[in-house]
């Protein structure tokens, strides 16, 4: 379940999906365990590893041709992590990758 909280502390349900979700990709770098590992553990009936935040983080999605600029960027800061999904075709509204920044 993907939730969002606005500035007035209102809680919104955006999507219910029985899979890992884009909004949780920052767990790869900012938590002790990624959503991917705990998802596989759940599917295999293994114990979940309790999530512990290691760092605050923000994530930006790279949509469509935005990916082209970052594919050419030779340098990222030590706290920036670039993920290119390596999709063969760039489409206008397609998520092509993301960048996680540890704060």
Where are these predicted regions, by residue range?
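Peripheral (often C-terminal) accessory segments that flank ATP-dependent C-N-forming ligase machineries
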Residues: 41-103
């Amino acid at each position: 379940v993907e939730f969002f909280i606005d500035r007035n502390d209102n809680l919104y349900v955006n999507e219910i999906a029985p899979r890992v979700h884009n909004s949780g990709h920052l767990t790869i770098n900012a938590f002790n365990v990624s959503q991917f590992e705990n998802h596989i553990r759940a599917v295999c009936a293994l114990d979940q590893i309790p999530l512990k935040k290691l760092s605050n983080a923000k994530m930006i999605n790279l949509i469509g041709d935005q990916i082209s600029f970052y594919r050419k960027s030779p340098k990222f800061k030590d706290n920036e992590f670039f993920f290119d999904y390596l999709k063969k075709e760039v489409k206008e509204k397609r998520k092509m990758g993301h960048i996680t920044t540890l704060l």
